[in-house]
Regions:
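C-terminal motif of bacterial Sec signal peptides marking the signal peptidase cleavage site
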Residues: 6-9
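Immediate post-signal-peptide N-terminus of mature secreted/exported proteins
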Residues: 12-64
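Intrinsically disordered, glycine/charged-rich N-terminal periplasmic/extracytoplasmic linker segments
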Residues: 47-149
Length: 149
């Protein structure tokens, strides 16, 4: 989590150019790739609380179903399966973000531009998949919880 704080604290997504400070506009392919990687990271971090809240809501819904009479549980079995799947999706999204943050090395191959470009291209793809997992799992869980039964 400390790495996440550093990423968020050190990355300014604004494009203003203050006197004496360099502009945040990407100037090279490396800069552009790093900006795209950080954008993916920021989307993930901005949804971390929502992931946590949604996990709690899905768990509460599953707990509520488990307390119903057997006949009602049987009627809600297909919905419970969907909720279980949504819970797994949310858990995976959290896991994927944590794993990506642990493994990401902001300074990887700084002295070898070709290796750096390849590394950042790969990381852009990875963080894109993480972002997709986060957004899709949140949308799925949200639509299930809003469903009228």
């Amino acid at each position: 989590m400390a790495a996440a704080f550093v990423f968020v604290a050190c990355h300014n997504s604004g494009k203003e150019d203050h006197t004496g400070h360099p502009s945040n506009e990407p100037k090279t392919q490396e800069d552009s790739l790093m900006a795209e990687v950080m954008d993916g990271h920021e989307v993930g971090m901005s949804k971390s609380k929502k992931l946590e809240d949604m996990q709690a809501k899905v768990k509460a819904a599953l707990d509520s179903i488990s307390k119903l009479p057997a006949k009602a549980q049987q009627q809600l079995a297909p919905y419970k399966i969907q909720l279980d799947s949504a819970a797994s999706g949310l858990s995976y999204a959290v896991y994927a973000m944590d794993k990506w943050m642990e493994e990401f090395n902001m300074d990887s191959a700084k002295d070898n531009i070709e290796a750096r470009i390849k590394y950042l291209t790969d990381e852009k793809m990875k963080v894109g998949k993480v972002k997709e997992a986060i957004l899709n799992s949140l949308a799925t869980a949200d639509s299930l919880l809003r469903a009228k039964l």
